[in-house]
Amino acid sequence: MKAQRSYDMRSRSASAEATRMRILEQAQALFLSRWYDEVTIATVAAHAEVSGQTVLNHFGDKEGLFAAVVDHTSGEILGRRDRAQPGDVPGAIEILVDDYEITGDASIRLLAVEHRIASVRKTMDTGRNNHRDWVERIFAAPGVTDELVVVTDVYAWKLLRRDRGLGRDETVASMRRMAEALIQTQTSAESTKRRRRR
C-alpha cells in the first residue's frame, strides 16, 4: 500500500511539473510576442489548455507568472551570451544579434511600459546591468565601455533591424564596425599615451 501511495505521489508530482512547464512555455511565448498588458491569466490558460485557476495555483498571479517567465528567459539569454569568448568581437556580435532576433522585439515592448509597471522596470534594470557586465567581460575596453554598451544595446539592434530594415547579416556587420571602431579608438589612445610617457 505504501509503495502504491509513493508511486501515486511521484506520478502526481511529475504531472504537476509537466503542467507547470507547459504553462511557463506558453506564457513565455505570449510575453515574447505580445504587449505585457495583452497577456492575461485567461489567455495563458487557454494556450496551455488548463484552467485559469491552475495557472494561479502554480504562479499566484500575473506578476508571479511574469517573474517565472523572466527567470526562465534570463537563463536562456545568459546561456546564449555565455558562448561569446572575451576578445572575439565578431563572434560576440553574432551571438548578440542572434539573441536579439529572439528577444529584441519583446525587450522593446517591455521598455515602452517599464515606467508604469514596477515588475517590468525591475526586470529591465536587471537586463541593463547584465548587458553592461557582459560588455565589460567580452570587450575588456574600459575606456569605451559606455559607448560599447550603447552600440550593442537592443535599441541599436532595433534602429538597424526594424527601423532601417537591414537584414540580420547587415545588422551584424554594422554593429561589429561600430564596436571595432570604438575599441580601435581606445587602443590608439592608449598607444599615444605610452609614447608620450617615454
Task: Identify the residue ranges that each predicted region occupies.
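Helical hydrophobic small-molecule/effector-binding pocket
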Residues: G64, P86-K122
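N-terminal intrinsically disordered/low-complexity leader segments
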Residues: M1-A18, E190-R198
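Amphipathic alpha-helical linker/stalk segments
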Residues: A29, S33, G64-A92
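Alpha-helical DNA-contacting segments of helix-turn-helix folds
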Residues: F59, G64-T73, E114, T123, ...
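Amphipathic alpha-helical packing segments from all-alpha helical-bundle domains
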Residues: D98-T103, A118-D146, E170-Q184
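Helix-turn-helix
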Residues: R22, Q26, L30-G64, A68
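Amphipathic C-terminal alpha-helical segment
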Residues: T145-R168, E180-E190
